[in-house]
């Protein structure tokens, strides 16, 4: 009944990028060996690969799968991000950041197909946000957010929604299907490599 291991994708987050989907269990090739991986397209816009064992979870690598400007870098050993202070919301300021508080992937599930070896992600790219942090007084029965939020699309963006296919053995995106509007559809993949979304 106790937590045996964990990995924190980012710390002290003020973007509302809590993770709402479970990682996908799959074998992944890295540096000549097969690892038991936890793969997770995070709301923060990064595609995370972690190694799992009975009593440990360790960072392997992470790559942005949508445009992301809040992280300046990731520590290559731990995966801990360094934040770009221009894109970290704080009380008393108005801050723009990408992806939006809905994330690069929100509730809709991604899917892995062992036949194709591909991970399929329902993503929203070119979807950013603005948060105006402000002091609030708690009032029972009222929203207690401490922020005013707005969703934005960068000038010149030609799409938002995507279905992405990633080869997790190479860590590379294989193909993308773009949509003019958001993609809120989950993905199911079958034997024979059909995709339903």
List where the protein language model places each region.
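Short coil/turn segments that connect the beta-strands within blades of beta-propeller domains
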Residues: 35-36, 117, 192-193
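Long hydrophobic segments that form regular secondary structure
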Residues: 98-139, 158, 165-172
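Extracytoplasmic beta-rich repeat domains
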Residues: 5-25, 63-109, 137-148, 157-160, ...
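Short coil/turn linkers that define WD40 beta-propeller blade boundaries
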Residues: 1-2, 55-57, 117, 171
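A short loop-to-beta-strand structural motif that recurs across blades of beta-propeller domains
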Residues: 46, 162-164
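Short, solvent-exposed loop/turn segments at conserved positions within beta-propeller repeat blades
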Residues: 40-43, 155-159
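Phosphate/diphosphate-binding loops
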Residues: 24-56, 60-65, 92-96
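Conserved small/polar residues in nucleotide/adenosyl-binding loops
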Residues: 196-197
């Amino acid at each position: 009944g106790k937590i045996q291991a964990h990995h924190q994708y980012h710390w002290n987050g003020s973007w509302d990028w809590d993770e709402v989907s479970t990682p996908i269990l799959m074998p992944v090739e890295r540096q000549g060996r097969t690892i038991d991986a936890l793969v997770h397209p995070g709301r923060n816009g990064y595609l995370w690969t972690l190694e799992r064992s009975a009593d440990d979870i360790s960072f392997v690598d992470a790559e942005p799968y949508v445009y992301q400007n809040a992280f300046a870098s990731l520590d290559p050993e731990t995966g801990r991000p360094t934040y770009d202070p221009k894109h970290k919301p704080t009380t008393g300021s108005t801050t723009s950041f990408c992806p939006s508080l809905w994330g690069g992937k929100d509730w809709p599930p991604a899917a892995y197909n062992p036949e194709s070896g591909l991970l399929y992600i329902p993503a929203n790219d070119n979807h950013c946000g603005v948060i105006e942090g402000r002091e609030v007084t708690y009032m029972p029965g009222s929203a207690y957010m401490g922020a005013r939020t707005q969703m934005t699309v960068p000038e010149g963006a030609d799409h938002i929604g995507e279905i992405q296919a990633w080869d997790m053995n190479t860590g590379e995106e294989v193909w993308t299907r773009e949509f003019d509007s958001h993609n809120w559809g989950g993905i199911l993949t079958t034997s024979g490599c059909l995709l339903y979304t």
